[in-house]
Amino acid sequence: MATLRVPLLVALVLLAVAIQTSDAGPYGANVEDSICCQDYIRHPLPSRLVKEFFWTSKSCRKPGVVLITVKNRDICADPRQVWVKKLLHKLS
């Protein structure tokens, strides 16, 4: 029984390492390319509070637009929302 413990322990450690490294985010030269939205803002943001925006990477699981406020806060928004589309059109 003791002879099975060592190979089993080694296999479990290797599996744990493989799982952790496979969940790495995208790599890129731009910081913007590595930002993905976990969740979206739930209410419309007034356009006077937003100074610019950028799109999240295509490698992200959820599509997103990062709105940068006049106070330099990054806020994720759902690009499918009507208010977000209007805001992006206004900023473009």
From Swiss-Prot:
Q: Where are the transmembrane segments?
A: none
What Gene3D superfamilies is this protein classified in? 2.40.50.40
A molecular function GO annotation: chemokine activity
Listed under GO biological process in this entry are: immune response; inflammatory response
Per UniProt, which keywords does this protein have? Chemotaxis, Cytokine, Disulfide bond, Inflammatory response, Secreted, Signal
**Free-text tissue specificity from the UniProt record:** Expressed by activated splenic B-lymphocytes and dendritic cells. Low expression in lung, thymocytes, lymph node, and unstimulated splenic cells.
The set of disulfide-linked cysteines is: C36-C60, C37-C76
A single GO CC term, please? extracellular space
InterPro entries on file: Chemokine_b/g/d (IPR039809), Chemokine_CC_CS (IPR000827), Chemokine_IL8-like_dom (IPR001811), Interleukin_8-like_sf (IPR036048)
Signal sequence bounds: 1-24
Q: Which SUPFAM superfamilies match?
A: Interleukin 8-like chemokines
Keyword Transcription regulation in the entry? The reply is: no
* Compartment list: Secreted
The family classification in the record reads: Belongs to the intercrine beta (chemokine CC) family.
Q: What does this protein do?
A: Chemotactic for activated T-lymphocytes. May play an important role in the collaboration of dendritic cells and B-lymphocytes with T-cells in immune responses.
Full protein name: C-C motif chemokine 22
**What gene does the UniProt entry assign to this protein?**
Ccl22
